[in-house]
Amino acid sequence: MPTINQLVRKGRQSKVVKSDSPALNKGYNSFIKARTDISSPQKRGVCTRVGTMTPKKPNSALRKYARVRLTNTMEVTAYIPGIGHNLQEHSVVLIRGGRVKDLPGVRYHIVRGALDTAGVDGRMQGRSKYGTKRPKAAKK
């Protein structure tokens, strides 16, 4: 326990808050070729690799992911949500924050229905999360 005098001389250090999605907190100025501290809710990037990985125990599946080089020159691993996708190498995608609990190192999600990513086909519920357009009304 510190004395009052010790606290007066050197106060308590505040805790450092670590970001859940650090790649969204950095920008890039291409004129001076330097990183900036401008943050954004989403970022655009180009897929460098698309594949599947297996989740941690006790889950079992083949989860789809993409390695994405962002416009701020960082490279991150992003999860591809939904059933089926049209992504391949050099596809331009939009990523948002949000980790996948059973995939280590995956801290980002790809936004379905934006840029080169198509929405999920035949989806009726939760369409806005998967970039699916409203189905046409059936004729009477």
Curated annotation (Swiss-Prot):
Sections of the chain in a coiled coil: none
Composition skew (Basic residues), residue ranges: 130-140
An individual GO BP term: translation
Residue positions where 3-methylthioaspartic acid is found in the record: D102
Cellular component, GO, one term: small ribosomal subunit
MF terms in GO: rRNA binding; structural constituent of ribosome; tRNA binding
Stored Pfam families: Ribosom_S12_S23
Keywords noted in UniProt: Methylation, Ribonucleoprotein, Ribosomal protein, RNA-binding, rRNA-binding, tRNA-binding
Functional summary from the UniProt entry: With S4 and S5 plays an important role in translational accuracy. Interacts with and stabilizes bases of the 16S rRNA that are involved in tRNA selection in the A site and with the mRNA backbone. Located at the interface of the 30S and 50S subunits, it traverses the body of the 30S subunit contacting proteins on the other side and probably holding the rRNA structure together. The combined cluster of proteins S8, S12 and S17 appears to hold together the shoulder and platform of the 30S subunit.
Family label: Belongs to the universal ribosomal protein uS12 family.
Family annotation (NCBIfam families): rpsL_bact (TIGR00981)
Subunit structure of this chain's protein: Part of the 30S ribosomal subunit. Contacts proteins S8 and S17. May interact with IF1 in the 30S initiation complex.
Name listed for the protein in its UniProt record: Small ribosomal subunit protein uS12
Source organism of this protein record: Exiguobacterium sibiricum (strain DSM 17290 / CCUG 55495 / CIP 109462 / JCM 13490 / 255-15)
Top-level taxonomy: Bacteria, Bacillati, Bacillota, Bacilli, Bacillales
